[in-house]
Amino acid sequence: MSDGVGTFRMVPEEEQELRAQLEQLTTKDHGPVFGPCSQLPRHTLQKAKDELNEKEETREEAVRELQELVQAQAASGEELALAVAERVQARDSAFLLRFIRARKFDVGRAYELLKGYVNFRLQYPELFDSLSMEALRCTIEAGYPGVLSSRDKYGRVVMLFNIENWHCEEVTFDEILQAYCFILEKLLENEETQINGFCIVENFKGFTMQQAAGLRPSDLKKMVDMLQDSFPARFKAIHFIHQPWYFTTTYNVVKPFLKNKLLQRVFVHGDDLDGFFQEIDENILPADFGGTLPKYDGKVVAEQLFGPRAEVENTAL
């Protein structure tokens, strides 16, 4: 009987402790949602190493490889490749690192994500061109979408959408997607968010048949396209709560557009929120999402994103 042959490496004690800590984190173990990340927590660096294949000594090399790949592809003269090179030209290495992290330090896949990022903007210019900062602010103040001021226990940014009071005549679907895109772009400047990702909570309490009938398949596809391969973001979970029976019709329109990876991260809870609260702590959720905090106030988040109202100018992106 021959001895089994294998390889192993000794895991440093500090690394073992950090991995153990990752299993017991609370919402208080993470940095702020808004603004830059001054210093990544040690357990988040360990998470980046374990989940994203990130090593401090290979970051610069990966960025350089992506820069070279962008130029090499642009040399082919292909239209999208040229658009990617133009988009990247004025951006720093921190911008490229977002894409590398989102694709676990696979430079080839990071480039494909860059192409998706640029193509989404070319495909849907109405979400990006000549936007009014004042209009964006008003949409975000109305809570479309919302953002929790605390990360969840996994360090993810939690985005909220409460459909009950939404009237498409007052706030259009495109205006909501414009706000989503603006928020994603802003919050992805934070390295902790790049590593830990996002979680989306959709509250469908009060969702009417009239609202369901007004949702066009083209709009729903645009929303799904935003979530898939168009941002250097890790969308880790999408939770639907309090949905009525006819929500199934809307969801069945969306499902064919979802890739299997994202589909597996969709959770439909109905009115039984026990499983939902195991993932998202009640003490960080507003009352209108079943939590213990006061009702969501979009003006607080808008001030974090835009500053005090007196300092805001009506300018274009």
UniProtKB/Swiss-Prot annotation:
GO BP annotation list: visual perception
Domain spans labelled CRAL-TRIO: 136-297
Cross-referenced SMART domains: CRAL_TRIO_N, SEC14
Keyword Glycoprotein on entry: no
GO annotation, cellular component aspect: cell body; centrosome; cytosol; nucleoplasm
Compartment list: Cytoplasm
Superkingdom of the source species: Eukaryota
Disulfide bonds: none
Quaternary structure annotation from Swiss-Prot or TrEMBL: Interacts with DEGS1; the interaction increases synthesis of chromophore-precursors by DEGS1.
Described function: Soluble retinoid carrier essential the proper function of both rod and cone photoreceptors. Participates in the regeneration of active 11-cis-retinol and 11-cis-retinaldehyde, from the inactive 11-trans products of the rhodopsin photocycle and in the de novo synthesis of these retinoids from 11-trans metabolic precursors. The cycling of retinoids between photoreceptor and adjacent pigment epithelium cells is known as the 'visual cycle'.
The protein's name: Retinaldehyde-binding protein 1
Organism: Mus musculus (Mouse)
Lineage: Eukaryota, Metazoa, Chordata, Craniata, Vertebrata
Protein encoded by which gene: Rlbp1
